[in-house]
Swiss-Prot record:
Belongs to the type II topoisomerase GyrA/ParC subunit family. Heterotetramer, composed of two GyrA and two GyrB chains. In the heterotetramer, GyrA contains the active site tyrosine that forms a transient covalent intermediate with DNA, while GyrB binds cofactors and catalyzes ATP hydrolysis. It catalyses: ATP-dependent breakage, passage and rejoining of double-stranded DNA. Residues 830-846 have a biased composition (Acidic residues). Its EC number is 5.6.2.2. One of its GO terms (molecular function) is ATP binding. Keywords: ATP-binding, Cytoplasm, DNA-binding, Isomerase, Nucleotide-binding, Topoisomerase. This is DNA gyrase subunit A. Pfam families: DNA_gyraseA_C (PF03989), DNA_topoisoIV (PF00521). PANTHER family: DNA GYRASE SUBUNIT A, CHLOROPLASTIC_MITOCHONDRIAL, DNA GYRASE/TOPOISOMERASE SUBUNIT A. The gene is gyrA.
């Protein structure tokens, strides 16, 4: 080794080449530099043009390649290579993926790239390789690049200082809010939804002339997100949040339609899906839920989407409520999603969360800056042109002398200097005169120069006015926005469902309809729409309403709304609650399902009474046992009932609950007895009691085997309907029943004979309702009460339903007629009346 080399090595080793540093501080500094690099140069959009660097470079690269919307398509690979070579020295796949997304109609609300070829699909299919696809700028991109050659934005050196690239685009098109943006930086993320261009322009124009406009005012123009895949937004709570704070969550739901099919089947047709949802994955998820039996009721699933749009068909099984099934799909799949908004963008190279007004104001300020820079550029250019033309005009006005001066000059420099001195011209003017062509000396050209100078002076005056007059600048920007709106504005795609809650409740999509709830003695329950039973004349034989097991009989039925609460009172004195729609829908002849499948009753616990209710805030529950005990409890005591039930009444041995009704607190109570007697007394003679109370005597029985068969309150009607087990009944004015004391035996309400059988129900009615009757064999008849005659107390009534010898009438229910669309069917001898005595004979039994 050369001795000099050894000395150099020693000298190098003696120098400090390793810098000591705290690892904590070094990590902190290095990580912050990396984080800011990601934030500023990669992940977050610039607030003025809504673009990340790679998007801006793709657009500018295509622009410098001449690939505007009016030029032929070029291979995508050529664009990617140009961008990568000059502006973005990173992966070609990153550039191509960016370009692909800007060309997808389901990704961007307003596409910035006009793609030709396979650019992927909403099913998640990848775009074809860049060597196969072609692209160019879209028409709307021209508005983002408009006037970029007029010194409207600053340029910086590219990565190797061989080219210059813009740090922001002029972007007359409000891209940040129109197309939105998403990205994940270090410690922060942005997710800005797209909006409707016409709405944005309306809001921008309002803010242009009303600097102090509130966000509430801007909401009159800008309604909320407008996604390229349309769909529906639930409520405006999330919209209000991010409009005001820049952050919020918007619930987006697929648009669906229900097509009714034969055999009680339906098709649920999905025509729009939430933004950024992969359609193929969505369908696979539904299929998986069906396969694992997490969702039941789907018979078939088809994707019938085509060029016309999305169409996902979900065929239901028989008797499945499509609204409930759809609601289950909303809960379990991406048919409903939450779009978490974070309007984070770069403002002066610093990340900032923007509310709606701030985002719009940044756009407006940017456009003012663009307009001022453009105007200054054009003014400078116009003044330069005017300066030259003024010199040419001077020359043409003194053309002979100018020619003579040039002829006598030694050279061009001498001619230039002589002209400058003689006519007080500038260097540029003198050069322009020397460069004049001979044809410019013609009279017509001289006149044209005068006109051109006048135009330039007018232009200069106009440009100077723009710089001095803010109102003029506002008018120019407003007119430009109107032009953009006229070219590219369109109707809103996403529907905003005001007032809807994003929290999914099964009941929200269940139609409100009148239904019949039937209960057998074994506790089997089922629900059937009232429309399943057609209206008949009284005396009809009816239709099969319920199949039962051999040792089971239909015991009762009630008519209620699908959105009513059902209270089940049991022989243990407990009460349970479910919603009426939770009782499974059955056919007229189905057996139903055991109550134990719906409520948590014990093995030996039996249902005794059903009550439908919608309001617990006022009034009372009035109880009657079969042995005649009564009590009343405030309805509010039952507003909260746990799954395991709640004590409702204390029952004595050998007694059971008969019925519970809702009262106002100041009514009259009518209690019917199986022997044909009825007690009428004031409700308030029974004091309000607690839930665990046993009650007081409401009626005394004439016979040991008597029991309570009817319980009504005066608000239910003015006529008392009495029905017997042999299918006969009548209506009597309630005023024919005199007021008695609580605990009395009552007065006659119907004459009981072997032909009538025991009385099974008394009920106050108005007379314009309909009567639903069910026999011991499950046969149901629906009869207008208008066909039941009004008679005196001591009569036996008329035939209501035809029964065979072994059949008895088991239960009745009254309901108001909301819509009579039923067919009437004749009956056998509907006007048959049984023998009666004088109805006015007083046979009161105290």
């Amino acid at each position: 080794m050369n001795p000099n080399d050894k000395n150099n090595i020693k000298e190098l080793l003696n120098k400090t080449v390793v810098k000591e540093a705290s690892i904590t501080k070094e990590l902190e500094t290095s990580f912050m530099e990396y984080a800011m690099s990601v934030i500023v140069s990669r992940a977050l959009p610039e607030s003025r043009d809504g673009l990340k660097p790679v998007h801006r470079r793709v657009l500018y690269g295509a622009y410098t390649s001449g690939l505007t919307h009016d030029k032929p398509y070029r291979k995508s690979a050529q664009i990617v290579g140009h961008v990568m070579g000059k502006y973005h020295p990173h992966s070609d796949s990153a550039i191509y993926e960016t370009m692909v997304r800007m060309a997808q109609p389901f990704s961007l609300r307003y596409m910035l790239i006009d793609g030709h070829g396979n650019f992927g699909s909403i099913d998640g299919d990848s775009a074809a390789a860049m060597r196969y696809t072609e692209a160019r700028l879209s028409k709307i991109s021209a508005e983002m690049l408009r006037n970029i050659d007029k010194d409207t934005v600053d340029f910086v050196d590219n990565y190797d200082a061989s080219e210059q690239e813009p740090i922001v685009l002029p972007s007359l098109f409000p891209n940040l809010l129109a197309n939105g943006s998403s990205g994940i930086a270090v410690g922060m993320a942005t997710n800005i939804p797209p909006h409707n261009l016409s709405e944005l322009i309306g809001g921008i124009k309002h803010l242009l002339v009303n600097e102090n406009a509130t966000i509430e005012e801007l909401k009159e123009f800008i309604k909320g997100p407008d996604f390229p895949t349309a769909a529906e937004i639930l409520g405006e709570t999330g919209i209000n949040e991010y409009f005001n704070t820049g952050r919020g969550s918007v619930s987006v739901r697929a648009k669906s339609e229900i097509e009714e099919l034969a055999n009680n089947k339906s098709n649920i047709v999905i025509t729009q899906i939430p933004y950024m949802v992969n359609k193929a994955n969505l369908i696979n998820k539904i299929a998986e839920l069906v396969k694992t039996e997490q969702i039941q009721g789907i018979a078939d699933l088809r994707d019938e989407s085509n060029r016309e749009g999305i169409r996902i068909v979900i065929e239901t099984k028989r008797d499945v409520i499509p609204e409930v099934l759809l609601n289950q799909l909303y809960k379990s799949t991406q048919l409903q999603t939450n779009f978490s908004v974070a309007m984070l963008a770069l403002v002066n190279n610093q990340p900032k969360v923007l509310n709606l007004k701030e985002a719009l104001q940044i756009y407006i300020d940017h456009q003012f800056d663009i307009l001022l820079r453009k105007t200054n550029f054009e003014l400078k250019k116009a003044k330069a042109s005017a300066h030259i033309v003024e010199g040419l005009v001077i020359a043409t006005n003194n053309i002979d002398d100018v020619i003579e001066t040039i002829k006598n000059a030694k050279d061009n420099e001498d001619a230039k200097n002589t002209l400058m001195t003689k006519y007080e011209l500038s260097d540029l003017q003198a050069k322009a005169i020397l460069d004049m062509r001979l044809r410019s000396l013609s009279g017509l050209e001289r006149e044209n120069l005068q006109k051109e100078l006048a135009k330039l002076k007018e232009l200069i005056k106009d440009l100077e006015e723009i710089l001095q007059n803010k109102e003029r600048r506002i008018k120019i920007i407003s007119d430009q926005l109107d032009e953009i709106d006229h070219k590219f504005g369109d109707e809103r795609r996403t529907k905003i469902c005001y007032g809807l809650n994003s929290t999914i409740d099964n009941e929200q999509l269940i139609p409100v309809e009148t239904v019949v709830i039937t209960r057998s003695s074994k506790g089997y329950l089922k629900r059937i729409p009232i429309s399943a039973y057609k209206v008949q004349h009284r005396g009809g034989v009816g239709v099969k309403g319920m199949n039962t097991y051999e040792d089971d009989d239909v015991e009762s039925l009630i008519v209620c709304s699908t959105h009513s609460d059902l209270l089940f009172f049991t022989n243990y004195g407990k009460v349970y609650r479910i919603r009426a729609h939770q009782v499974p829908l059955g056919s007229r002849i189905s057996k139903g399902i055991p109550a134990i499948n719906l409520i948590s009753i014990e093995k030996d616990e039996k249902l005794m009474s059903l009550l439908s209710i919608n309001d617990y805030d006022s009034g009372y529950f009035f109880f009657s046992t079969k042995k005649g005990l009564v009590k009343r409890v405030k309805a509010s005591e039952f507003s909260r009932i746990q799954n395991n039930g709640k004590i409702a009444i204390k029952l004595t041995e050998n007694d059971s609950l008969f019925k519970v009704i809702k009262t106002a607190g100041d009514e009259e109570i009518y209690i019917g007895v199986s022997s044909g007697l009825l007690v009428r007394f004031k409700e308030d003679v029974v004091r309000s009691m607690g839930r665990t109370a046993q009650g007081v005597i409401g009626v005394k029985f004439k016979n040991p085997n008597d029991e309570v068969i009817g319980l009504s309150s005066s608000h239910e009607g003015s006529l008392l309907l009495a029905v017997c087990e042999k299918g006969v009944g009548k209506m009597t004015d309630r005023e024919e029943y005199r007021m008695t004391n609580r605990g009395s035996k009552g007065v006659i309400t119907i004459k009981v004979t072997p032909k009538t059988g025991n009385i099974i129900n008394t009920q106050l009615v108005n007379g314009n309702e309909e009567l639903l009757m069910i026999s011991s064999t499950g046969k149901i008849v629906r009869v207008p009460l208008a066909e039941v005659s009004e008679q005196g107390r001591n009569t036996s009534g008329v035939k209501l339903i035809s029964l065979n010898e072994k059949e008895t009438l088991q239960s009745v229910a009254i309901f108001d007629v909301e819509q009579d669309d039923s067919q009437q069917v004749g009956s056998d001898n509907p006007d048959t009346e049984l023998s009666s005595d004088d109805s006015n004979q007083d046979q009161d039994k105290e």
